[in-house]
Amino acid sequence: MKRVILFAALVCSSPVKAQDPSARADDFGKGIGPILQEYCYDCHGRKKNKGKVKLTDYGSWADLEKNPELIEKMIEALGKNEMPPEEEKQPSGDQRELMLLELEKAFKNAMAHSKLVVPLRLRRMNRFEYGNAVRDLFDLKSWVYSINDRIIRDHNNYFRPETGKMPKVARVGNRIMGLQQLLENRLLGVMAFPKDPPAENGFNNRGDHLSLTPTLMESFLELSRSVVNAENFDKNCQTWNDLFQDPSQKPSTTGFGSITADKSAARRSTGLTLSAWIRPSKVTEKWQTIVRREDSWRRQLLAIGGTGGTWGIWMGAGIEGRYVEFGAPVKPNALGDGKWHHVAGTFDGKQMSLYVDGKQVGRKAIVGKLYTESKETMQIGSYQNEPFHGDLNDVRLFRTGLSKLQIEEIADGKQDVAKEEMVGSWKRNDDVKPELKQPIEIIAHERIRKLLLRAFRSPADAKTLKLYTEYFDKQYKESGDFTKSMKDVVSGALASPRFIMVHNKASDASPNHASFNLATRLSFFLWSSIPDDGLLVLAEKGKLQDPEVLEGQVDRMLNDRRVKNFCDSFAPQWLKINNLVSASPDFKTHRNYYFGGDDKISYKRGMHMMLEPLLNFETVFIENRPIMELVDSDFTYRSHLLEEWYQGRAATYSINVNLRDIEFTRTPLKDRRFGGVITTGAVMVMTSGPFRSLPITRGSWVSSVIFNDPPEPPPDDVPDLKADDSTLQKEGLTVRQKLNQHSEDSRCAGCHKKIDPLGFALENYDLLGRWRDKYRTGLKVDASGLLFGKHAFKDVVGFKDAVLAEKDLFAKAFTKHLLSYALGRELTVVDRIAVDEIAKASEKDNYKLRDIIKHTVIHPIFNQKIKR
């Protein structure tokens, strides 16, 4: 069978070139035709018409190539040994191999002749994307609204893709629900987002589910007004001075500023020193940015906060082609006492050192050359959701690593220390008086132009720009209130289809509209948000579609912390993890599954369990591990509560145990019954019923999620299985034996043959996700089976081996999920070649997750360089 996969891959990787059907007529009659006649016609045309497939209608390649959907189904059924059924006469290995090869050729030929083109469907943002887009547009320090799509709450800054490593400890909590949502840092008084339709066998960014009706347009207008008029919007908006602040008035002091380094920093740099005076108003576990230049692995930063169990001061820099970070512990109350403190970080090519009030608090030997070529600015006190709380002043940037003595002198208040080495500085000046060099209207018009560029993801055409600027002029003339007039303009932009619609066409005002379209697709795929300035600049220059530039941007974006949005959105939907919310083991029988009082359900353990597979996914993502580790891995993340649970010794905790802020520790695994996402308690519980595990549901989950092959729903008149404990004990049967009786029904046999082995492989896990060797009836669990009719296994470890033996099939299935998410639509038969090509390109690096993402982006189906 390995030869089949190899030959099929070679066929799929060859150029799409149509063959003359008449030249292949004899091939059909002498090759695949007789094989179909001998093994397939009885069930599909001659005597029966199973699956509504009548193969006798196709007597030539020309006939068959008119139905590429059928060809695809035939390839999948033959490849998985699903056809012919095992009880029927089977073709030889050579015959099966010939059929697969010829059908692959036919499929390629059909696609070459096909006129089918699947355009990117026009769709609106969903709730998750809208919140991210508004937050990024205004660089908000808070969320726009509380949202359950974001399951994991990060409490110790664990998600840091730029490091390429997940920490030993991740302090996290689950999404908050009910009244607890009111406590989350969010804009106050924002109206509810129009309800998104649920995703069934897909993702909630699918264009066929996300339309825009006149009623929705009215809702979005009300929503946009409530955003800019939220009572805490002004203080949370970090673009306030650049957009809303009256230019004739003193700038607001809610933000800080930035430093643009002198060019000599790149020419004559021997190191780096970041120095600042700080007065925190509060200390938090999350990082607080003092100064940061964001440029992928080339970033430079100085911050306070906690990560990996250490709270203190942190310095980071790009050294020798990689990002290096070092933190030194400092007692939080030493900096949070309401007084001014001097902090600094230095790197001299040999060592990174950290200082507080002139005293060295930590050092680490790091040898290498500092990267200095970045053109990005140093942001003061602000980076995404890591703002500085309190006051900053006298921030200095040096092109060399200063000595201990020089740091002591700065901490003592000296102003001219190493002045010749200083390449940038920033000081707060509360006495700055603005000097208007242009009329206020001209300043406002330029602000609006920049706003629309970011909001609409492309330059606004002259007519559109005039519409918004004239509206501002009218509002400002009537009210004389600059801020209110600008908010009216902004709320209109946020309600515009140009903002709300994701796959809208970029304005023809730019000759590079194709690049702007690509920037939008890319940012919504990886960040679930609008493009940043870096993407827009490249789009404006028409460079984004250049392969090397595009690859570089993908690397940058995958190392940006906004990529957490991808993990928060794709992973839970792929795993269908939200099904765990409604899973409810019987309260009386399984009381210890619930936290709370003796007579009420307060909190389910499932809400805690679901963090394990999501953290495992993030580990594979951040560390760019092979996706096979999502099936079987030698690590997992567990809290002490989850560890107790798996060992069957969990106590009944009251609800006051801290479940929204708890440590998950990276745990090595030697027992292969655990590891990966399939056998986590989360998946086992959500695929069970109130009283027992459900092998059919589990098998359906594996088929849908792991192999992207969801089974057809059962007929409406199928009788209940009646497999409760009392019935099974009375009949002396296991669930498996009972199900075998049920599967004798011809209407049920086909699906059960496919999903039953997948579900029974997991039967050693009870409905609570814990291991068992016997059922409660005392009968022994039988988890043996046969995967795709060729991989026999005795238990779940053997099942994992069987899945890994089909890693190419799993990789293609995963790629289908990923591509559907990336394109925001259901895949069709036209997309099969693209899936094969993306998977084939990722194979050489053993299907590493980030590599699959990168190959998806650079493939023509995503960047739309060509149309198939």
Question: Language-model features: where?
Answer:
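Low-complexity, glycine/serine/threonine/alanine-rich intrinsically disordered linker
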Residues: Q19-G51, E65-K73, A77-E82, E86-S269, ...
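Hydrophobic core residues within well-ordered beta-strands of beta-rich domains
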Residues: L272, K339-H341, D391
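Hydrophobic h-region of N-terminal signal peptides that target proteins for export
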Residues: I5-A18
